[in-house]
Amino acid sequence: MPPIRQAVSLAEKKAIRDYYNQSAHRIPQKEVTEWFRKTYNKDLSQSTISEILSPKYSYLDDGSVRLGDIKKIRAPKFPLLDNAVYEWLQQREVEGLPISGDMIKQAATRFWSKIPAYASLPLPDFSNGWLDKFRRRHYIQQSAVNQALESIKFEVFREYPVHIQEFIRPYAQKDIFCVGGTSLFWKLTPNKQNLDYQEIQGMKRGKAKVSLIMCCNADGSERLPLWIVGYAQNPRSFEQCGIFPKSMNFEWKWNGRASISPIIMEEWLRWFDTRMQGRKVLLMLESNDTYQFGVESVRRFKGGFQNTSVFRIPEKTLDIKSPFEQGIVDTFKANYRRYWLQYSLNQINILRDPLKAVNVLKAIRWMLWSWNFGVSEKTIQASFLRSGLLGPHSEAEGQGMESYQKAIMEIGNLISSKGSEAVKQINEYIRPSEEDETKLHQDAVDTVAAEFLEERRFESDEEEDVEPQISNVEAAMAFEVLIKYFEQHENGDPSFVLDLYRRQRVIAPNNLIA
């Protein structure tokens, strides 16, 4: 006999979403199920919990709306379409573009043909009745259509730099953060054109791409885990090697364009604000519509920012720049390209095609090395000074670029390229203009529709690469080798050896090697 289905009220659904969204870290749905059982004495299936946490019920997160009003509004019949149209609408608002009821219906028609989940279904009638229900679901006033919303704006300073510095002055440098994004063609090889789009087994090399969200504070004491966006929800190399991104200290996201979408940016902003709990920090963002969309979405719904003041770096000024454009991204990419080229040459020496041998997991390890060790505190500090955000920056010119220069030299040695022209080509290889997505115009409907493409299991054309699962005993033995190695150093660091002992005992407390 099948279990009796238990009714879940809107108030209970809202409580589930609040519990999940307000947790300090992302919690598994199993934990949400257990919490609900203890709190409400009801047993819900994981599929029910998953549905409640899906975008279908995102309207429950708006704290300004009463549950009594919500009861009058039915959930959308096609939630993916509803979410896509709403995100498109918000992008139009952010960009200050005109909006009309007919434009909303036309966007819905275009989205229908681009969302695979609806490919086999007949096109609905996007009538005035559908439009009215859409407006009511998202609390869009009639006056808000035909004009861009003006209720929420950034702190934008377009006059003199001193105004910006006065705004920043109350914050200690450890509490001043900047976030930036970039794309990375992680299989890119150097050539005369610096970016070769020749086909590799039917896939252009430029398609082997990820996008990254980077964030650090002004004194370089905190660099947050990278957020890396690819094409596949769970890349084949992750599954085959049994790895967990959080254990490697990065967050993995995905969509059909491997790009930083407004939805991902909104999620990142909430994640950042939660990490800053108990502090009052300033977050500076590059001038980018995606970032602006994310900030406005956070401010408009779900309680807004609790620990963070947001400031957008002016787009057109000679005096103020993003710190990421003053050395941080260049240093990161130079170190990544160095690791990738060294790997490529090693594979060529053993008669393997590096473009097939590499996979996104290997590339991510080089990204993590480059971010955590290639970009030094000195590089970050000097980049903030050169940005002009903290005051006059002339004394910072050329500082903090040692890691970048070293990587440039090593890349030149790897490809046997020397001279001023070679340096120019290496610089263009490290930072090709095609990776700067902010300069490329994207159709708003296509951009949003990419969020709903079917899942991929791979990032690029690559060979199978299965890494064996490491047992506790094997890990403990590896620690034993490390411990003996450092014990044999006459001037070794005893605190480091003790730390190895502690970690070994955590891994295999009952299987220590004598």
From Swiss-Prot:
Transmembrane segments: none annotated. One of its GO terms (molecular function) is DNA binding. It comes from the Eukaryota. Its main location: nucleus. Keywords: Centromere, Chromosome, DNA-binding, Nucleus. InterPro entries: CenT-Element_Derived, DDE_SF_endonuclease_dom, Homeodomain-like_sf, HTH_ABP1_N, HTH_CenpB_DNA-bd_dom. Signal peptide: none annotated. It is found in: Nucleus; Chromosome, Centromere. It holds the Pfam family HTH_Tnp_Tc5. GO terms for cellular component: chromatin; condensed chromosome, centromeric region; nucleus. Residues 69-144 form the HTH CENPB-type domain. Binds to centromeric K-type repeat DNA and ARS3002 DNA. The CBH-binding consensus sequence is Py-Pu-A-T-A-T-Py-Pu-T-A. This is CENP-B homolog protein 1. It comes from Schizosaccharomyces pombe (strain 972 / ATCC 24843).
